[in-house]
């Protein structure tokens, strides 16, 4: 079975192989590559590793959902936003205000379910003058 890493790559990284050639006299110091001096002056923080574990092609990709993502999706499912979001605006969007208020309500009512927290947040935002459509 063929491997994607050649035997030369397993014997060491390119820096160690060039260093070996210079020490053995097979490569003159004046003929060293341009990147060699840069590598010597500032080596990488973690050494290169040829034995990297790559994901297999048949492994499923894990779904990563944060609580805020699920809440934002539920918000937009309930209240369709017709307004555009301005990236350079200093104002927070209605959905972000909803999420911030939801976190406050959740910290005050830890025993409430998600649906109850959602309704409490709706009521609190309506009381504060933010109209949800």
Swiss-Prot record:
Subcellular location, record wording: Mitochondrion
GO MF: structural constituent of ribosome
Example GO biological process: translation
Pfam families: MRP-S23
Principal subcellular localisation of the protein: mitochondrion
Gene Ontology CC terms: mitochondrial small ribosomal subunit; mitochondrion
Keyword terms of this UniProt record: Mitochondrion, Ribonucleoprotein, Ribosomal protein
Subunit structure as annotated in this protein's UniProt entry: Component of the mitochondrial ribosome small subunit (28S) which comprises a 12S rRNA and about 30 distinct proteins.
Similarity comment: family membership: Belongs to the mitochondrion-specific ribosomal protein mS23 family.
Protein name according to UniProt: Small ribosomal subunit protein mS23
Source organism per UniProt: Caenorhabditis elegans
Gene label: mrps-23
